A protein has these predicted regions:
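Serine-dependent carboxylesterase/thioesterase catalytic core
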Residues: 89-179
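Solvent-exposed, acidic/flexible segments
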Residues: 37, 50-58, 77, 81, ...
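N-terminal Sec signal peptide cleavage junction
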Residues: 20-23
């Protein structure tokens, strides 16, 4: 299986993608080389969601983080990990010779996050970066769905996981574990509840049936402000070199 191809789908993943709809739009344009000391943040959306869908949590978080100096943030569809790799390499390639050398590798910290199938793509992407000897400061999985989305590769410094475990069919991957505990620290796994307030009060009106059928908890998590507030803190901490979660009570 190539990194671009979806793996054999489990029932859980199949329901996640069932009748997803929505045509893919052209992806982001290539970035300029970013300044040294920057934080490059890559987000992956779930299902068949468009890379630029402003109503999805992954994209909303990216647009919020873009307002902060020193953070360079872009989002991609979960099927476009190779496109995201090209984006990162272009951002690091200061001399524009088409290669990322050892000095350029250290120009920026890299943070990767994703929701649903985007959580699966987060680890697929981290493994691609490992193949290029590119370190990852943080991987953040949000209600991750997919195959082989629990093993965090050893080029990742910190890993975090936000999930719900009450969905009728879809429950986020947990626990995650480092391939090499000497190199990767799982800073935390946080479970969110949707069988009582405030979780079960989150409105999912207006979503198509395939986004809510047997997966209401999964849909609510994407709209849960607690989730994205936590995600924002974790990303900011990692970009600033702090242990993610250290800036606020867990």
């Amino acid at each position: 299986m190539t990194a671009e191809a979806l793996p054999g789908l489990t029932l859980m993943t199949a329901v996640a993608c069932l009748a997803c709809g929505g045509a893919s739009r052209p992806g982001p344009t290539g970035p300029p080389a970013i300044p040294p000391g920057s934080c490059l943040v890559v987000g992956f959306l779930g299902g068949n969601d468009r890379w630029d869908d402003p109503f999805k949590g992954v994209r909303r978080l990216a647009l919020e983080l873009r307002r902060e100096p020193g953070l360079y943030v872009e989002t991609f569809e979960n099927r476009r990990v190779r496109r995201a790799l090209g984006f990162v390499e272009a951002a690091l390639d200061a001399d524009r010779n088409g290669e990322v050398d050892r000095e350029e590798t250290g120009r920026a910290s890299i943070v990767v996050y994703g929701q649903s199938l985007g959580g699966w793509a987060t680890l697929v992407f981290a493994r691609l970066l490992a193949g290029r000897d590119l370190p990852v400061q943080l991987t953040l999985q949000i209600d991750s769905v997919g195959w082989d989305d629990a093993d965090v590769p050893p080029n990742v410094r910190w890993a975090a996981n936000l999930y719900q475990d009450e969905g009728a069919v879809i429950a986020g991957e947990h626990p995650i574990k480092p391939s090499d505990p000497r190199r990767t620290t799982v800073v935390g796994e946080w479970e969110f509840d949707y069988d009582r307030p405030p979780g079960n009060e989150i409105a999912i009106d207006g979503l198509p049936w395939h986004k809510t059928f047997l997966r209401a908890d999964h849909a609510r998590m994407d709209r849960d402000p607690r989730v994205w507030s936590k995600a924002a803190r974790l990303v900011r901490d990692a970009c600033e070199g702090r242990v993610p979660g250290a800036s606020a009570a867990r």
